[in-house]
Amino acid sequence: KHNFLNHGLSLNLVIKPYLALEGSVAFPAENGVQDTESTQEKRETGDEENSAKFPIGRRDFD
C-alpha cells in the first residue's frame, strides 16, 4: 500500500502542472472558442486597452 500511494502522488505531481500549462491546448473546443470570441469583442470595442495589454501583437501588425 505504501509503495502504491507514493507512485500515485508522484503521478499527480507530474500530471497537474502539465494540465495547467497545456489546459488551453488540451481543451480548445471548450475554452479556446470562448476566449477567442471575448478577445475579438475587446479588440472591436477598445483598441486603446489592447495596445496596453498586447503590445507585442500590435508591433507585429505595424
Swiss-Prot record:
A Pfam short name: Pro-MCH
Highest taxon listed in the record's lineage: Eukaryota
UniProt-listed GO biological process terms: chemical synaptic transmission
Region (NEI-like): 44-56
Region spans: NGE-like: 23-41
Residue span of region Disordered: 29-62
One term under GO cellular component: synapse
Signal peptide coordinates: none
Region (Melanin-concentrating hormone-like): 60-62
GO molecular function: melanin-concentrating hormone activity; type 1 melanin-concentrating hormone receptor binding
Family: Belongs to the melanin-concentrating hormone family.
Protein name: Pro-MCH variant
Source organism of this protein record: Pan paniscus (Pygmy chimpanzee)
